UniProtKB/Swiss-Prot annotation:
The active site is at H108 (proton donor). Coiled coil: none annotated. Involved in the heme biosynthesis. Catalyzes the aerobic oxidative decarboxylation of propionate groups of rings A and B of coproporphyrinogen-III to yield the vinyl groups in protoporphyrinogen-IX. One of its GO terms (molecular function) is metal ion binding. This is Oxygen-dependent coproporphyrinogen-III oxidase. The record marks H177 as: Important for dimerization. It is an enzyme of class 1 (oxidoreductase). It is found in: Cytoplasm. The gene is hemF.
Length: 302
């Protein structure tokens, strides 16, 4: 179990993604290297990269973190109660890109490795991650491209993984109180160890490496599309759903805050502008209504 190899991969992935996104945007990611004091309950370090006010990205963050703690927080043991009381080591890259143009979808990607340790037992490790797309104005060809790229990343590791991880994503990124999906999904996995460490790590790398091919062509095609105040207002309204999900349901956000993580890095996933309108409904037959009827309901995109 070579966690240093995982760390090296994650740092390189962060470099590659920020380089490509910066080239398309024309702006520069600011790097904020941080380290937790050894006296705090959560120890470790990380490297947050953020671009705000760009031509493409109104706000985009790509964070790397490598942290350790003496006791797993409740969010990490909810599905694994046998691990309660163990110490842990966690490392990962997480990103959220909130584009300025409403025709470019918001995108989220995360890959991570987790090790739960106890002095009198063997370490328990697993990988997690995935990526998902949140359009404001949907295009079938974009959704199909994104899902086909996810499917291709998983294909070498078993044909059953894509439909399994897609369903997991559809179930996970769902706002129960709204009875609607956050977006058009993608793939999501957690507690994954079934291929052995090396092969599971390879699968995680394949997912991480698929992010740029999945999202960048969509951004390149849509970022120059003309838009007005109507589209920006709808984008801000739908971003409100993103805020609701991240603060109420997201396991990564809850884990970070419960374990004493760095709030600025954890909350970089928040959109720069969002709003709420009481009982707002889209005009029937409008492009905004099409998001609800044609894109948010779970469906097969490949």
């Amino acid at each position: 179990m070579d966690t240093q190899a995982v760390r090296a991969y994650l740092l390189d992935l962060q470099d590659r993604i920020t380089t490509a996104a910066s080239a398309l945007d024309g702006g520069t990611f600011v790097t904020d290297a941080w380290e937790k004091p050894p006296t705090e309950r959560l120890r470790g370090s990380g490297r947050t990269r953020i671009l705000e006010g760009g031509a493409l990205l109104e706000r985009g963050g790509v964070g790397f973190s490598h942290v350790m703690g003496d006791t797993l927080p409740p969010s990490a043991t909810a599905n694994r109660p046998e691990l309660a009381g163990r110490g842990f080591e966690a490392m990962g890259v997480s990103l959220v890109f909130h584009p300025r143009n409403p025709y470019v979808p918001t995108v989220h990607m995360n890959v991570r490795c987790f090790v739960a340790v106890r002095s009198d037992a063997a370490p328990v490790w697993w990988f997690g991650g995935g990526m998902d797309l949140t359009p404001y104005y949907g295009f079938t060809e974009d959704a199909s491209h994104f899902h086909r790229t996810c499917q291709g990343a998983l294909a070498p590791y078993g044909d059953e993984l894509y439909p399994r991880f897609k369903q997991w994503c559809d179930d996970y990124f769902y706002l129960k109180h709204r009875k609607e999906a956050r977006g058009i999904g993608g793939i999501f996995f957690d507690d994954f160890a079934e291929l052995g460490f090396e092969r599971s790590f390879e699968m995680m790398r394949s997912v991480g490496d698929a992010f740029l091919p999945a999202w960048l062509p969509i951004a390149e095609q849509r970022h120059a599309t003309a838009y007005g105040e109507r589209e920006r207002a709808f984008q801000a309204y739908r971003r409100g759903r993103y805020v609701e999900f991240n603060l109420v349901f997201d396991r990564g956000t809850l884990f970070g805050l419960q374990s004493g993580g760095r709030a600025e890095s954890i909350l970089m996933s928040m959109p720069p502008v969002a709003n709420w309108r009481y009982d707002w409904q889209p005009e029937p037959g409008s492009p905004e209504a099409a998001l609800y009827t044609d894109f948010l309901p779970a469906r097969d995109w490949v």
